């Protein structure tokens, strides 16, 4: 629920962003100087397309904007490999940035890899083992596209969900207003399967070919090809992209094991890096993952006090398609929006 406090915070943030844009436009602030001081940040991208579509979700940037951001970073910061970021193997007098991509969509290979090659920029791509189970999509991407194409109401497991729109169109449960994406995230896998079946039966996927950029995943051969590129490192992102923090320890262990085994077999390389789906985890998960060989673990925000001194764990910042690049670099510098 949007409270007055959160609304006033958003208004103040928007005014600050407008002011920053004006300062950059008038030349009162130079964008190239924003990252001039020493610092470090891990950036998270997801999907790239031709136009920077934000109608489905907030996870896509245009390929042109991504290239401009990599160009800026290559000229005004130090882009480092994730392994070097973890080990501190970079010039501490510069602003160090590690680039990461989550989810393993095919558009990463089409749009991101050529840019990385052009600017000699390393990046880590965190993939699920969807290709190993012959899955055509990740459930969140399926839901985003299907919601756009599906009827106004849908019934799943005896619950009725109705579409509502603010920035994005979403399904909400009639009984309590909870978003369908949250039902899927926090429910057993059987609910996700029931959701997909209900949306498919409702004809939600009949025109999905027009939206392939937003759900198609990398095939095993494409993963193998990317892994052979010296700019690319492959990391793990779970088996089915479930929220590991809400699974039993054994279910979470299998999610990690299936993913790690598949990626290592496919690439012929060790996979020591793990990005937690949704950025959530528990301390038990951190220990379990470390025992499985994940020495580089990535959250979004730290969740526990001891995380700050845990050399196996780092925070990341998701890139925001709704703000200007000037405001994006200011946020990267501060580590928050």
Regions found by a protein language model. Give the residues of each.
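C-terminal active-site subregion of NodB/CE4 polysaccharide deacetylases
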Residues: 2-100, 107, 138, 142-144, ...
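Short acidic, Gly/Ser-rich segments with clustered Asp/Glu that frequently serve as metal-coordination loops
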Residues: 103-110, 115
């Amino acid at each position: 629920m949007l409270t007055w406090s959160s609304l006033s915070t958003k208004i103040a943030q928007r005014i600050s962003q407008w002011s920053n844009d004006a300062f950059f436009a008038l030349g009162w602030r130079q964008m190239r100087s924003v990252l001039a001081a020493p610092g470090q940040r891990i950036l998270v991208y997801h999907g790239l397309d031709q136009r920077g579509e934000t109608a489905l979700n907030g996870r896509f940037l245009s390929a042109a904007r991504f290239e401009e951001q990599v160009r800026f970073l290559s000229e005004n910061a130090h882009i480092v490999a994730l392994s070097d970021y973890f080990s501190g193997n970079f010039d501490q007098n510069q602003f160090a940035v590690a680039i990461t991509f989550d989810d393993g969509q095919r558009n990463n290979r089409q749009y991101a890899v050529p840019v990385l090659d052009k600017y000699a920029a390393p990046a880590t791509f965190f993939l699920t083992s969807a290709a190993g189970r012959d899955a055509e999509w990740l459930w969140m991407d399926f839901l985003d596209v299907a919601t756009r194409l599906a009827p106004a109401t849908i019934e799943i497991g005896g619950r009725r969900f109705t579409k509502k729109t603010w920035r994005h169109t979403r399904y909400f449960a009639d009984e309590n207003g909870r978003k369908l994406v949250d039902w899927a995230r926090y429910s057993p896998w059987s609910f996700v399967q029931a959701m997909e079946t209900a949306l498919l039966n409702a004809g939600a996927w009949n025109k999905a070919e027009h939206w392939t950029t937003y759900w198609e995943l990398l095939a095993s051969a494409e993963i193998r090809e990317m892994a052979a590129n010296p700019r690319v490192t492959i990391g793990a992102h779970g088996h089915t992209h479930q929220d590991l923090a809400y699974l039993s320890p054994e279910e979470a262990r299998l999610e990690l094991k299936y993913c790690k085994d598949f990626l290592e077999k496919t690439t012929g390389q060790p996979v020591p890096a793990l990005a937690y789906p949704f950025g959530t985890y528990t301390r038990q998960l951190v220990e379990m993952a470390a025992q499985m060989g994940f020495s580089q673990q990535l959250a979004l925000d730290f969740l526990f006090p001891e995380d700050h001194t845990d050399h196996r764990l780092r925070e990341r910042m998701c890139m925001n398609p709704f703000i200007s690049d000037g405001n994006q670099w200011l946020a990267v510098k501060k580590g928050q929006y």
